């Protein structure tokens, strides 16, 4: 199995069991699944998604870009889902969404442009409130070890990040504080993650290939690393 070749996968036997199980799996189409909740956003979206949530993402998306477009991407996805729901079920089944934005803004743009991010958060909340459904908002991840070498796909203008570890960590803290003051319903990892040694965080909580993403073993749907997958139980 290709999954067994990943450095962060230690149980190769589990991968073999998964391959065997997939051979007998029944194919289902998305409209057959009870997607009452949908996670939408950037490349970090899956990590913030709740159990049984549908996930749709577009890599490289920023909160700033969404604010400037009037959240066209989100509107398009929601309109497409409602159309499918009504076509197959006769009604819209969506109860709420989780939106994932902001990590890329903090990594590459806030310090580089020395810009005020608070208006972005206000616009984000205003848009969420306009939807008329339950809405969750992603809180930014802790800042990882500065010497970590992400792949070039994670660079912007030739740099892996803009701003020092301390500068970006301060922005993360202020960002979360502002979200709370705006009454936004946050999806965020345990508070102690933000006090972990950044090198330890990068090695034990992020993907082993030095990417900018969280390890799947630490996703929200895994209770931030406390739960096993349990696919063979």
Model-derived regions, located:
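Alpha-helical cap/lid subdomain in secreted, periplasmic
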Residues: 85-213, 225, 230-233
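Short amphipathic alpha-helical segments
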Residues: 18-23, 53, 78-90, 223-233
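Conserved SGNH/GDSL esterase-like catalytic core that processes O-acyl groups on lipids
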Residues: 36-122
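N-terminal secretory targeting modules
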Residues: 1-56, 153-155
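Short, conserved phosphate/pyrophosphate- and ester-handling motifs at nucleotide-, phospho-/glycolipid
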Residues: 215-217
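Short, contiguous, pocket-lining structural segments
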Residues: 220
């Amino acid at each position: 199995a290709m999954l067994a070749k990943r450095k962060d996968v230690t149980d190769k036997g589990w991968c073999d069991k998964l391959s065997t199980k997939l051979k007998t799996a029944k194919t289902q189409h998305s409209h057959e699944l009870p997607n009452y909740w949908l996670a939408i956003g950037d490349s970090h979206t899956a990590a913030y998604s709740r159990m049984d949530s549908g996930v749709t993402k577009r890599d490289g998306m920023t909160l700033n870009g969404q604010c400037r477009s009037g959240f066209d991407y989100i509107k398009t996805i929601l309109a497409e889902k409602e159309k499918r729901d009504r076509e197959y079920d006769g009604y819209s089944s969506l109860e709420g969404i989780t939106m994932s934005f902001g990590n890329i803004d903090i990594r590459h743009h806030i310090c580089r442009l020395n810009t005020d991010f608070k208006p972005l958060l206000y616009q984000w909340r205003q848009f969420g409130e306009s939807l008329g459904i339950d809405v969750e908002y992603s809180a930014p991840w802790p800042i990882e070890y500065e010497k970590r070498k992400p792949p070039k796909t994670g660079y912007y203008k030739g740099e892996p990040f803009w701003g020092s570890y301390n500068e970006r960590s301060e922005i993360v803290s202020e960002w979360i504080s502002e979200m709370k003051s705006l009454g936004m319903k946050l999806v965020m990892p345990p508070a102690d993650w933000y006090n972990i040694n950044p090198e330890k965080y990068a090695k034990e909580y992020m993907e082993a290939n030095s990417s900018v993403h969280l390890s799947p073993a630490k996703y929200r749907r895994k209770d931030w690393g406390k739960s096993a997958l349990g696919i063979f139980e």
